[in-house]
Structures are given as structure tokens and as C-alpha cells.
């Protein structure tokens, strides 16, 4: 067997491995909190009797934080470093989570949105610092693989969040008062705040090496990044930012509207229990577990499977990326996701439900690949490119309300034309738009 290369050894050496594991754990946190926030959409609809478009403002409040705080976070990283920025981001999230207590007590929609915005600010700072840190913490050629693995933990957090929401936040609105429904968020967010506080202290006292290679990092093929030029002159970076805009928007939009969509397609606990009962044996045990669950909780489980698909896809994708170029794989997954949404539009019942759930799998490798393709060849402009791309996460504040407004006007299924457009652009970027290029300054 050939000896491992220096790059491979560096990837698995203790000097990289322990920090990588530590920071990767943070990906679980912002994945969990981001998806838990999406559970507030059906929750707020129940409390305040909101149309889809207004309920989607919870997503807008969260992702607007990326527009406001992504660039300032880049400057904060330059001032205090990656580690301290991560700690600050966790403490900001603690404050945001605790703000849900007065919001629930007063049953105030503006306070709910404010709490969501503050949590979003903390997650923005964590994402902006953790993503490039993982990308540069090891050999340049394996940056997409490394970030895809880290994003797998993000997906795990996302897969667990709907289960927590279904069990402790989402309720049968016909059996509780508005105040009682609002109050269900208090305990979960208090516990999350306590966990984030402990994690922030743990990271503060951990040993994360100071990384000073940000300006010279060139993932993939080396380009001609020139310090002082405008980041807008790099076409592949600008298109990559647009790709992130569409990716985050469509992923968040589908997940946010998922509970309501699955209910319109006839999901109910009795049908699910009957299916497992017909399997006998282990199926009967599952039936006993599902029996007391409400229809809303079953729909939340399906949303959890949507995120679990992303987890499976990222674990599998980290291996596929060693065989297939990241741009090509991104294009294939983009077209496949568009096909799944189209199938869900054209059908009803179980086919419509499961084709949408499968979109989670095809979403899996999009973020890490768009991100690494977007900053490829930037050289000393890498930090600016990263800031631009992370700012584009604001797509999560734009696409979901548009999807909600379309759903109010033409119905949820007909509104799915918007996600199809988003996925087709992502496919275009992977196959044709991601080649590193710089226009004349």
C-alpha cells in the first residue's frame, strides 16, 4: 500500500482532527436551531390565525439577520479571531432563546419575531465563522469533502429538531387557548439557552488553533485572486452567492410549508398506524408508538425525514465527491430535486408527500459545494467572497414569504413552480456557472 500523502496525513493528524471535531459539533447546533425555528411557522399560524405569507415572516426575521450581520461578522473575525467569534455567536443565541419567554408570556407576534431575529444573528455569526474555518482546516483539495461531512452534523440537528417541535411545541390548536399554545415554546427554549451557554463556555476554554491562512486559501484549482479588486468582478462568486440565495430559500421554504402541505395531502395518524399494523411484528410496536400521536405530529415527523434525507445525502455525498467532480454532482442533484418537486405538483397523496420528502436528500450536498465552488481561486479575496456568499443566505428571508404568498393565492402545489426555478438555477451553476472567472475591474 502506498504511503499516505502529506495532504492526506494532514487531514487526519491530531493537529487537525480535534479542532475539526470540535467545530463540526457546532454545525449540529445551528442546524438544530435553524430548523426548530421553522416549526414556528405552523405554531404562529395557530396562535395568531395568520395566512401563510404572514406566518413565513418568522423565516424572514431569522434569515434577514444574515443580510445585517454576515459582513460585520467577517470584520469581527479579523479583529478577535475565529474562536472568540464562535463563542460570541453562541452567547447571542442564548439571549435570543431567552427572549421567547416574554414573547410567549405576552402572546406578542412582534416579540416572537424579535426573538427569532436575535437567534438568527447568533446563528449568522456562527455560520460565517465556522464554515470558512472548516474549509481551511486541512488540505485544500479536500475542502468540499470536509465541509460536506461537517454539514452532515448540521443535517442531524435539523432531523432531530422537528421531532422536538412535534413533541413539545406543535399542539392540537383546537384543545388549547391561544395563550396556552404560545406558552409551549417557553420550556424548550429555556433548556436550549442553558445548553448553548454551557457549549459557549466549553468552546471558550477549548484549544482551537489560530488559522491565519484565510487570505491565501485557494480550494480546488488556483485562480488569480488579487487583493484590492472588487469581489463583484468574480462571476463565479457572484453566481455562487445567487446559488446560495436560491438554495437556502427553497430548502427553508419547503420545510416551513411542509407540515401544512402534508396535512392537505391526507396525512393522519390512523392511516400511518394502519400501515405499520399490516406489517406485523416490529410494525405492531411502531403502531403502539404512533397511536397517541396527532396528525400535526405525524406531519412534523415527515419534515424530520426531509432533514434526515439531507443527513444521509451528505454522508453519502462525502464519499461520492471523491469520485465525481463537485460541480457535476451539484448539477445532477439540482435537476433531480426539480424533478421531485414537479412530481409532487403533478400527484396527490403518498406520492406527492414522499417525492417532496426526497428533496431533502438532493438538497444535501448543495450548500458545501456551492460554497467551495464560489470561493475557488479567490486567493487573498477569499474572506470577502465568503462574506458575500454568507450574506446571500438572506434568501431564506425572501423565498419562503414568496412561496407563502403564492400558496395563499394559487394553492400550495401550484406554488411549487418557484422551488423548481430555484433548483434549475442551482443545476445550471454546478454544470456551467461555477468555473472561476474574473471580469475586468
Q: Residue ranges of each PLM-predicted region?
A:
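Extracytoplasmic
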Residues: 18-48, 254-262
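Extracytoplasmic gate region of multi-pass secondary transporters
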Residues: 37-41, 230-304
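Central cavity-lining transmembrane alpha-helices of secondary-active solute carriers
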Residues: 57-75, 304-316, 395
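Helix-to-loop junctions at the C-terminal end of transmembrane segments
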Residues: 69-82, 312-325, 407-408
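C-terminal ends and interior cores of transmembrane alpha-helices
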Residues: 91-106, 335-348
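Intracellular juxtamembrane helix-capping segments at the cytosolic ends
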Residues: 125-139, 364-379
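Glycine-rich segments within core transmembrane alpha-helices of 12-TM secondary carriers
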Residues: 142-170, 387-399
